[in-house]
A protein has these predicted regions:
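Beta-propeller blade termini and top-face loops
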Residues: 2-332
Length: 332
C-alpha cells in the first residue's frame, strides 16, 4: 500500500490541509479561509485534482492536491455536494441549496443546470429542518456509479433519494426503502451493485444490493437511529460502517454522544471505536482507501483523525489536527 501523506478537510468555513514531508513531520495549512467551504471531491483518475464547494462563492479547483486554488464557476451558488464521474474525469457534478443539480463536462470550466431535477415528483414538500430560517432543502450527497458511466444517485436533505440512468438528463421519484433525510450516500468503490446510506429517518441506515433500484433498512444491532455518515470496505461490499446518534443535537451539539458500528452482512451491527460508547466527538467523515481492505479513517468534528487497519477493532490517533471536519475528508 502506498503511504498516505495528505489529509484535506472542509471545515464549513475553510480548508485545512495536513501533509507529511520526507522527514515524517506534519505541516498543517489553512486555505480558502474566506470562502465558507462546505464540501470536497477528488478526481479518482487524477489524485492531484480536487474540487471545493462553498457558500455563495461557487466551486474552486486545485490541480496540486490542495496547495493552490482557483475559482471554477457557479459563483453565487451555495454548493452543498460535489462528485466526479468515475469513468470520465472531465464530468463533475454539483448539488446546491436550494435543491438543484449542475453538471460540467470540461473539468468545472463551464456548467449547466440539469433542469429535469426540478421536475422530480413531489419535490414541492422537500424541506430541511437543519438550516433555519428558510428551511430550504438541498442536495446533500451525489453518488456516481463505479461501473455504470451514466448512473448516479442524489440524496436530498430532507426529501428523497433519486436515481438517474442517463447522466442527469432524467430522474426517478424517491427510491423505495431509501431514507428521505439523506446525510451520506455512497456506492461501493468497485462493485456497482452496492449503495450505502446514513440518514436521519427510517432507522438511520439503509443499503441497496441492486444498483440503487431499492434499499433495505438495516436497524438490527444499532443502539441509536440518527445516521450521520457511512462508508464501506473497498474490497468486501458486505462490510460497511456507520456512525449514529440519538438526535441531531447529540450528533452535532456542544456535548455530542455518538456510536460507531460495523456490519459484515451476516449478523447485526457490532460496536467499534477507540473509546467506550458513547464517543464524545462526532465522526462526521468515514473514509476507506481503494485496494486496502480493513483500513478505515474517521474524521471528527474536533479535527482529530483516527485510523484503523483491522476493520475498526483497534485504532490510533494521527498526529495532527484539522480544526474541524464537516462531512468532507479527502486522503491522498
Amino acid at each position: 500500500m502506498t503511504e498516505l501523506k495528505t489529509f484535506i478537510s472542509a471545515t464549513g468555513s475553510e480548508i485545512v490541509r495536513a501533509s507529511r514531508n520526507g522527514d515524517g513531520d506534519w505541516k498543517v495549512l489553512t486555505l480558502l479561509s474566506d470562502k465558507g467551504v462546505t464540501c470536497l471531491a477528488d478526481d479518482p483518475g487524477n489524485p492531484g485534482i480536487i474540487y471545493a464547494g462553498t457558500q455563495k462563492q461557487g466551486v474552486w479547483r486545485s490541480d496540486d492536491a490542495g496547495l493552490t486554488w482557483k475559482a471554477s464557476g457557479l459563483d453565487g451558488q451555495c454548493i452543498k455536494s460535489l462528485a466526479v464521474n468515475k469513468h470520465n474525469s472531465n464530468v463533475v457534478y454539483a448539488g446546491t441549496k436550494p435543491a438543484l443539480m449542475f453538471i460540467s463536462s470540461d473539468g468545472a470550466q463551464t456548467w449547466r443546470e440539469l433542469e429535469s431535477f426540478r421536475q422530480i415528483p413531489n419535490r414541492w414538500w422537500w424541506f430541511s429542518p437543519a438550516e433555519p430560517p428558510d428551511f430550504r432543502p438541498y442536495v446533500m450527497a451525489i453518488a456516481p456509479s463505479p461501473t455504470e458511466p451514466d448512473l448516479l444517485l442524489a440524496g436530498i436533505e430532507f426529501g428523497a433519494v433519486v436515481r438517474s440512468e442517463d447522466n442527469g438528463l432524467s430522474w426517478s421519484s424517491h427510491i423505495h426503502g431509501a431514507l428521505r433525510d439523506c446525510h451520506s450516500l455512497k456506492f461501493h468503490a468497485t462493485d456497482g451493485k452496492w449503495v450505502y446510506q446514513a440518514g436521519g429517518s427510517g432507522g438511520g441506515a439503509a443499503v441497496s444490493p441492486d444498483l440503487g433500484y431499492s434499499f433495505l433498512k438495516k436497524r438490527e444491532g444499532l443502539s441509536k437511529h440518527y445516521g450521520i455518515v457511512c462508508a464501506s470496505d473497498p474490497v468486501d461490499p458486505e462490510v460497511w460502517y456507520i456512525c449514529v446518534a440519538s438526535s441531531p443535537f447529540k450528533a452535532y451539539g456542544k456535548f455530542p454522544e455518538t456510536y460507531l458500528f460495523r456490519s459484515d452482512g451476516h449478523s447485526g451491527w457490532k460496536p467499534i471505536g477507540w473509546a467506550p460508547h458513547p464517543l464524545h466527538s462526532s465522526p462526521t467523515a468515514l473514509v476507506t482507501i481503494r485496494d486496502t481492505p480493513g483500513h478505515l479513517y474517521a474524521g471528527l468534528m474536533n479535527g482529530e483523525v483516527w485510523q484503523s487497519c483491522d476493520y475498526g477493532d483497534s485504532w490510533r490517533r494521527l498526529p495532527f489536527n484539522l480544526k474541524r471536519i464537516w462531512h468532507s475528508l479527502l486522503i491522498n
